[in-house]
UniProtKB/Swiss-Prot annotation:
This is GTPase Der. Residues 387-471 form the KH-like domain. HAMAP family: GTPase_Der. PROSITE patterns: G_ENGA. Residues 476-499 are annotated as: Disordered. It comes from the Bacteria. The gene is der. Belongs to the TRAFAC class TrmE-Era-EngA-EngB-Septin-like GTPase superfamily. EngA (Der) GTPase family. Residues 488-499 have a biased composition (Basic residues). GTPase that plays an essential role in the late steps of ribosome biogenesis. It comes from Aeromonas salmonicida (strain A449). Associates with the 50S ribosomal subunit. Keywords: GTP-binding, Nucleotide-binding, Repeat, Ribosome biogenesis. It holds the Pfam family KH_dom-like.
């Protein structure tokens, strides 16, 4: 599960500065969802190989009233869902009543809290932070978010348990890779040259073929996620949701259909049947992002009556960036007249044309029309994302792509694609080796991706294609002349001098 780090503190202590520093290596995902805290931001960050989600909860000073109190409550809800809380204070401004009010709340949450004193550059940090020890939150960690001083060591300490888990998972993955079939590059190139590629065994069984398919139902508030969840589980199924101890994660509900096991990840909380018609759905962006990271397939639910919004595109962008398979679900399709339906389809083609590989279903979660076909697309997307393809098959497909459309010329020389092999799955990752691949235009890269998708019949899953430049065996070597060549060179130079 992707860890979540929440930045908490009163206004103007440097939370946004630290947020921007943590997310600078990745494009920050900014989501302004109605009903959530104003100016609340969510971003992806990376520490080594560990990816985590950063939440800027907005300023809290403990004295909010009215609508400000409601916004503060939403920020405190984000704290409850976080794995690590960085409580930021201003070392230059000193301890304030707002700091004490926030600290009192954090002590009650029993969360893993790190007290972070920002803006310690240019002052005596030890003296400035001494008064913050009275907050009873343990050690005070000094940083300068604007310059990055102390940030790395703070993250390594705060995320240490998750880093250890990542190392253990990487070791297991390396052990699995060692068991996989290795191939001899030179032998493969000889087979390519001779046209002797055996593509009969083009796929292999995945090591988790018997595991349940995890799919997450994601989308904006009030698009019918919980209604769809209960419809897929069965209306008579009574599910207790958000029990104590489960608020940090989405609700995982196992189910089985046609002898296929599934795990439904509901980001809105699975309701009892009698509560399906509540007008206000419980919604959390953090739950959605974590569910996307943990799922195999994501069902993005769109309201047909509101068409596509920027929030839908933000969630879809996170799904694709995470490499997850996607199925588009247009809900509330019943009751629309034919002209409105045509307008909705045209809008989908216009704004979502870049994911033409995803299945689109027009359903009514309330009445159940079209819901049963979702399972077919879920299985199709999952199988596309996890199916393994042999090196011989991928290389042959690459050759056919070159035969249909040759790579362009670069500096008078043709870009040469030598061979391709699988570099991973879920999503499928294809590694292509060759010469001058760094100069290959993006248009030809997209052509190769589409050719692989069509040839392998991959639906619902993105494809990652990586290009690795083959090493030049003569790079850095200086040609040496033989004795006869040296003598000939001297004769030519001597003859040229006489002229």
């Amino acid at each position: 599960m992707t860890p979540v780090v929440a930045l908490v503190g009163r206004p103007n202590v440097g939370k946004s500065t630290l947020f921007n520093r943590l997310t600078r290596t990745r494009d920050a995902l900014v989501a302004d969802f109605p009903g959530l805290t104003r100016d609340r931001k969510y971003g992806q960050a990376k520490l080594g190989e560990l990816e985590f989600i950063v939440v800027d909860t907005g300023g809290i000073d403990g004295t909010e009233e009215g609508i400000e109190l409601k916004m503060a409550e939403q920020s405190l809800l984000a704290i409850e869902e976080a794995d690590v809380v960085l409580f930021m204070v201003d070392a230059r401004a000193g301890l304030t009543a707002a700091d004490q009010a926030i600290a009192a709340h954090l002590r009650k949450t029993h969360k893993k809290v790190f007290l972070v004193a920002n803006k310690t550059d240019g002052i005596d940090g030890d003296s400035a932070v001494s008064e913050f020890y009275c907050l009873a939150l343990g050690d005070v960690y000094q940083i300068a978010a604007a310059h990055g001083r102390g940030v790395l060591s703070l993250l390594e300490l705060a995320l240490a348990p998750h880093l250890e888990t990542l190392v253990d998972a990487a070791a297991e993955e390396d052990a699995q890779d060692e068991e996989e079939e290795d191939f001899d590059e030179e032998a493969l190139l000889r087979m390519v040259a001779a046209g002797d590629l055996d593509t009969r065994e083009d796929t292999k069984e995945t090591p988790f073929a018997d595991l349940p398919i995890k799919f997450a139902i994601v989308g904006r508030p009030n698009v019918g996620k919980s209604t769809l969840t209960n419809r897929m589980l069965g209306e008579d199924r009574v599910i207790v949701y958000d029990m104590p101890g489960t608020t940090r994660d989405s609700v995982y509900v196992p189910m089985e259909r046609d002898e296929q096991k599934y795990v439904v990840i509901d980001t809105a909380g699975v309701r009892r049947r009698g509560k399906v018609h509540e007008t206000v759905e419980k919604f959390s962006v953090i739950k959605t992002l974590k569910a996307i990271e943990d799922a195999n397939v994501c069902l993005l639910v769109i309201d047909a009556q509101e068409t596509i919004t920027d929030q839908d595109l933000s969630i879809l962008g996170f799904v694709l960036h995470s490499g997850r398979s996607v199925v588009l679900v247009v809900n509330k399709w019943d009751g629309l007249d034919q002209k409105v339906k045509e307008d909705v389809k045209n809008e989908l083609d216009r704004r979502l044309g870049f994911i033409d590989f995803a299945r689109v279903h027009f359903i009514s979660a309330l009445h159940g029309s079209g819901v049963g076909h979702l399972f077919e697309s879920i299985q199709e997307a999952y199988q596309s994302a996890t199916r393994r393809t042999s090196t011989a098959m991928l290389t042959r497909i690459m050759q056919m792509a070159q035969e249909d459309h040759q790579p362009p010329m670069v500096n008078g020389r043709r870009v040469k694609l030598k061979y391709a092999h699988a570099g991973g799955y879920n999503p499928p990752r294809i590694v292509i080796h060759g010469n001058q691949l760094n100069d290959l235009p993006d248009s030809y890269k997209r052509y190769l991706i589409n050719y692989f998708r069509k040839s392998l019949k991959i639906m619902g899953s993105p494809i990652r294609v990586e290009f690795q430049e083959s090493a030049n065996p003569f790079e850095g070597r200086k040609n040496t002349m033989t004795l006869s060549q040296e003598r000939q060179r001297k004769r030519l130079l001597k003859a040229k001098t006489k002229k």
